Amino acid sequence: MVKRNGVFLGTKAGAMVAWLALSMPTVSLAVPPTVTGSLDNRYSDNVTQSAVDEVSDTESRINLSIDHQTDPGRCMASTNAQVGYGTWWDEAYDPELYADAAFFGDCEIRQGLNWELMDSLNQVLQNSRGTDTPDNRTLKNILRTGPRYTMFLGQRDQLSLSAQYQNTEFREPEETDSQRYIGSAAWNHIFDPTLSGGISVSMDRAELDTGGEIDTDVASLNWQKNWAVTQLSASIGYSKLTSRFGSFEQSSDGLVGQVALMRDVTGSLRFFLNASRELTDQTSDFDVRFGEFTFNLRQTSEVEVTALDVGADKSFSSGETLRLVFFANRADYLRVSQKEDSVGIDTVYTRPLGPLWNFDASVRYEYANYDEASENDNTLSVDTRATYSLTRDLSLSGRVGHNRRESDRLANEYEESWVSLGVSYQFR
């Protein structure tokens, strides 16, 4: 029987969120939040995703989700959160807490001066080379807050200053937590109604609970361009990262940049591209901004990261939708000069089967290379679901899926088939 010990996130971040939320002016709650509860039972013939000694078990999970956005006003806030608690019938694992939540709040203190509060809580893997099972997962909470001041220098120029505090905590005590202080300044010039650009500088000072420190400085050129059906924003710059652990000190530098492109090809087809290259550490929010990217928490903290997402969204007159995403990621762990690369494709298809029935399916393939051990992994996941609406608020669902991994290392291979039945209710 597989067991794991862990404690939930510390109270520092939660206490600060509560204090700041109470300190902000009241936000408008004219539109009530959407709250949904569900109960799912999932049977798997290989819950540990093992190459040998496969274990079958059924997990019962209670889920609660909330989605809310306030009306525009002096203070605005948006919340999207899903929380679940699962237990295993044959105790293959200890009871598990699941979470995927994001909160953003912005209050105008006075003209030009705003206070921002952001918090994200996500399930992440501890070892990127491991399997997506409870004994290889942890919760990562990132709280960021601070003031932002914007000043207009004439009709075409704008100066923005910000100072932020960020706290990152993991559920497992063996993972590295951090506190960081981020200061930034940016100047932007409007060249014409469709083109603007400028320069920005930022200083990031991270203090790790292991006693280490990581300083990251960035200077960039930024620009934004809009066409009739296309929006482009990009930056290119120079970054220097310095890490200190006791008497050890190491510096790395290089070119960094970001690109975000969106184009409405037709009224029913949209193309998008997002790419970024940064010098950062594992307690940053890079894996939140690029969901296909995974930090390896078993490696050293300092890392040069590169991520690319290219895809398209297509809708059909019959109500069908198709989303296709190609992704490529690289993590270069600087202190040990080890690289992890991954490329893959993720496809999601949805189709209404009638006034009460809906069907969706997803297929994900990923190829991963680990240069340290000269190993390659190929992972394929298939997930299909049918949903039946009993009433406007009550629905039933059934899912069938299959996961498979082939690897140069036989111990990393596995094959899993699973089936799930669930019921959900939307409270009003």
Residue ranges and their predicted role:
Residues 1-34, 426-428:
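Cleavable N-terminal export/targeting peptides
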Residues 29-428:
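Gram-negative and organellar
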